[in-house]
């Protein structure tokens, strides 16, 4: 991966990431394609209509649904899904924990049963990379030990010790693969854990950065029960610990407000199910805030979802039509609503990037909140 810092405005950064399948411009939002597709959309929607640069795919689900050998035979996820741009694959560890009440975590990895058929499986740091090699994703995530919040200091200490150990094993394995001429196009990111505790975050970050050869670094373990202020404070003391010449990825976050604040604090990459999940549940994002499209007030509203939006849905359909489709449980609703919400998120990234390049990100941030009639958060964390 070739990383170029194209501009910086305060803490906000605009990078170019040259990956095997495509070049990615940051700040970037990655739509979540859990099982090889973004729900209700296909690869043409993603590339031609939304112009998405990179999609997140879930290692756990692809492993259980398809398996390593079939993924290899298909030539990886990009060929299988006919999306000729980049993919980031997560490690699948979170799903192994969260979807299996009896999952057992040891220093060697995670033992779990398939939520599909009850079959037994084991994820080691090395094996999750084997799955991601089969996916042939541009960016692979190491296996990490995520803790929910609040958690005891003892549990957080165990988490960062295990996370660092697994990261070291992953790095050694990845380097051995590259020495054999394998995995040369697959970049490996480490994940910084530590809850909202500055001491533990600093300790984990130092251990991972000192390993030296990761292609990027992620902040994990947020948006799991902490307040927004705790989230922003944690990001503010974590990003300075991350190398300036590597991309910074905030995992699983979040709301448009979360993303704008995190960009200001130096984060480059984001993913979240929120735009598509909210779309399926009648919540649509606009420049002026969220609307609940199933509400009766919209049943005769002939305006677009968002008058400032130029997405496919807003160009062709009205609020009244979307309200009708949702209330009628028409499947077309899910596509049109998902297209709108994802366009909103992706356009937010494009606007933020342009502001950074022009040196006007602070003014852009102010206008973002002014349209919503919201106070600008105090970012003196």
UniProtKB/Swiss-Prot annotation:
NCBIfam families xrefs: Q_tRNA_tgt, tgt_general
Its job: Catalyzes the base-exchange of a guanine (G) residue with the queuine precursor 7-aminomethyl-7-deazaguanine (PreQ1) at position 34 (anticodon wobble position) in tRNAs with GU(N) anticodons (tRNA-Asp, -Asn, -His and -Tyr). Catalysis occurs through a double-displacement mechanism. The nucleophile active site attacks the C1' of nucleotide 34 to detach the guanine base from the RNA, forming a covalent enzyme-RNA intermediate. The proton acceptor active site deprotonates the incoming PreQ1, allowing a nucleophilic attack on the C1' of the ribose to form the product.
Entries under HAMAP family matching the protein: Q_tRNA_Tgt
Enzyme class: transferase
InterPro entries the record matches: TGT, TGT-like_sf, tRNA_ribo_trans-like
Binding positions for substrate per the UniProt entry: 90-94, 144, 193, 221
Molecular function via GO: metal ion binding; tRNA-guanosine(34) queuine transglycosylase activity
Species per Swiss-Prot/TrEMBL record: Helicobacter hepaticus (strain ATCC 51449 / 3B1)
Keyword set includes Lipid metabolism: no
UniProt protein name: Queuine tRNA-ribosyltransferase
Protein origin, superkingdom: Bacteria
Cofactor: Zn(2+)
Cited Pfam families: TGT
Reaction(s) the record says it catalyses: 7-aminomethyl-7-carbaguanine + guanosine(34) in tRNA = 7-aminomethyl-7-carbaguanosine(34) in tRNA + guanine
Biochemical pathway: tRNA modification; tRNA-queuosine biosynthesis
Keyword set, alphabetical order: Glycosyltransferase, Metal-binding, Queuosine biosynthesis, Transferase, tRNA processing, Zinc
Annotated cofactor note: Binds 1 zinc ion per subunit.
Gene Ontology terms: biological process: queuosine biosynthetic process; tRNA-guanine transglycosylation
